[in-house]
Amino acid sequence: MRWNDDAVVPAKVSPDLEFLFRQGERLILEAVAAREEEYILDVGCGRAVDAALLSESGAVVIGLEPSEVMLSRAKEHLGAVSAPVALSRGVGESLPFRSNSFDKVICKGALDHFLSPDKTMAEISRVLKPGGEAIIAIANMESLAFHIGRGTFKLRAIFSPKADRGAKPWELPPDHTCKFDYRSISTLVKSYFQVKKAEGISLLYGMPGWGNILSLLPRPVRCGILALLDKAARPFPSLADVIVVKCALFSWRK
């Protein structure tokens, strides 16, 4: 597999997307709350940016990635920041690790790329130690912004048939195998885990014209607006741009 992330970040990054990336990284690392000597697995680690940051806690971190290209980029990044992260090639549906091996497993922005998210969740459950935690972060394809976007473009199509027909943020990217919203990710997770907390990150990313409006505002003003929207998104994951679910193994599992 030679998938790469070249198309993930657009050539021009809007203020709302920049904020989403930055805030997402910070809050997900907080959710993991890595501790010294914990064993942590990052499934679909990409460039291993999060894995490198997690290793700063003293945790033993392993990054799993199916793509040869991304593994190469991960090695470059880890070398550049001198992070002691081990890398392994493999897929989420068949994790190459023994059962009860990890204290925590993180899967950020990768579950919707897998052929079988259900098998992946089963495997994450298998490799976690009793009392272990899984932290799942996924793009919400039914966010408030995407609902507004779909409605806006339907109206545009009625009154302006020649309206822009390019790719839209609320359309499923070609490298995704499925789409998630709050209901579907909750249903999937609850098949294998007890949900400890579900939160939203960011609000209104991808709403038509929103990035352009923010670009016109002074930086302190737009940062304040984005921070307020992010705070508003936290208790409403069904409306947020990204959903983060922190969960634990069922207490009866030995």
Label the model's feature ranges:
Residues 118-130:
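A short glycine-rich, Lys/Arg-flanked "PGG" loop and its adjoining helix->strand segment in the class I
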